[in-house]
């Protein structure tokens, strides 16, 4: 029973988000870690992400039945009733938001709310099924965790938070399009209007290349803005160039699925590397950003 309730929260997604939360939190902490705040932020974000994933599983039951990758999910197989899953998701969300509000700060909580609403209310309920731009909208919610981690420490949305939002949003696009390419038939069978299905794989490759270039620029801004050091800069440049090279090789490959899977795997390596480096190679900016909102 416990295993089923764990599976429906998509623990892999939770773990991936925790890595980015830690990156944002430690970047902002700059070596001075409040461990109570750290724990509250990690657990709070985990609960909110878990809640969003359970709601997503509920909303996507009809789609999941049509896809090879998702046809054995807990709700599709009836291992947990839909009603129970809604109660479970609601309780997880309430607990997560309360922990962020009282354990971190209201700004961190509101960022969590915004990410949650975009993911569940905008992306899952509508955009995923009706628009080729669903991935773009969903990328904003996927970028929320590191920003929450950062703002849990700073209690302000400054240029550092904005750069993190840009980095992780831009990363989501080639990452997601790569999945859509090597899972092309699944998305086609479920009639999900992702870019590779609607516009074709060639167009998707162009978008992947452009987004990786934009991602590379955004990653450098963290050092140029005085938030991360030269070691981070070297790693960011290296992974960006390598990832871009992989994308460009996609124009000459014979098997798009194999190429897309490799691109997807490296995307995880890339974002994990950046999260680790921003955690350990931080700097104190010389001045505050012009874009600052203080609670």
From Swiss-Prot:
The chain crosses the membrane at residues 8-28, 35-55, 84-104, 107-127, 132-152, 162-182, 208-228, 233-253, 264-284. Pfam families: UbiA. GO terms for biological process: heme O biosynthetic process. It comes from the Bacteria. Its EC number is 2.5.1.141. It catalyses: heme b + (2E,6E)-farnesyl diphosphate + H2O = Fe(II)-heme o + diphosphate. It is a multi-pass membrane protein. Keywords: Cell inner membrane, Cell membrane, Heme biosynthesis, Membrane, Transferase, Transmembrane, Transmembrane helix. PANTHER family: PROTOHEME IX FARNESYLTRANSFERASE, MITOCHONDRIAL. HAMAP family: CyoE_CtaB. Converts heme B (protoheme IX) to heme O by substitution of the vinyl group on carbon 2 of heme B porphyrin ring with a hydroxyethyl farnesyl side group. Carbon 2 of the heme B porphyrin ring is defined according to the Fischer nomenclature. This is Protoheme IX farnesyltransferase. It comes from Enterobacter sp. (strain 638). The gene is cyoE.
């Amino acid at each position: 029973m416990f295993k089923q309730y764990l599976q429906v929260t998509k623990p892999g997604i939770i773990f991936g988000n925790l890595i980015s939360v830690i990156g944002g939190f430690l970047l902002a902490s700059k070596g001075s870690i409040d461990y109570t705040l750290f724990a509250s932020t990690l657990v709070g974000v985990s609960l909110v992400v878990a809640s969003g994933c359970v709601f997503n599983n509920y909303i996507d039951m009809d789609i999941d039945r049509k896809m090879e990758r998702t046809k054995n999910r807990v709700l599709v197989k009836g291992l947990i009733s839909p009603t129970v899953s809604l109660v479970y998701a609601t309780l997880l969300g309430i607990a997560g938001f309360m922990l962020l509000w009282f354990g971190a700060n209201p700004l961190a909580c509101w960022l969590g709310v915004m990410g949650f609403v975009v993911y569940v209310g905008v992306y899952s309920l509508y955009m995923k099924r009706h628009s080729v731009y669903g991935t773009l909208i969903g990328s904003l919610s996927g970028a929320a965790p590191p920003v929450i981690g950062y703002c849990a420490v700073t209690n302000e949305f400054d240029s550092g938070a904005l750069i993190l939002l840009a980095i992780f949003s831009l990363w989501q696009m080639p990452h997601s399009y790569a999945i859509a390419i090597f899972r092309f038939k699944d998305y086609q069978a479920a009639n999900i209007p992702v870019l590779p299905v609607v516009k074709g794989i060639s167009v998707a490759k162009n978008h992947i290349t452009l987004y990786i270039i934009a991602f590379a620029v955004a990653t450098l801004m963290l050092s140029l803005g005085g938030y991360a050091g030269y070691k981070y800069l070297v790693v960011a440049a290296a992974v960006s160039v390598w990832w871009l090279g992989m994308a460009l090789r996609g124009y000459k490959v014979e098997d798009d699925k194999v190429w897309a899977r490799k691109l997807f795997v490296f995307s995880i390596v890339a974002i994990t590397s950046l999260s680790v480096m921003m955690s350990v190679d931080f700097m104190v900016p010389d001045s505050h950003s012009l874009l600052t909102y203080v609670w």
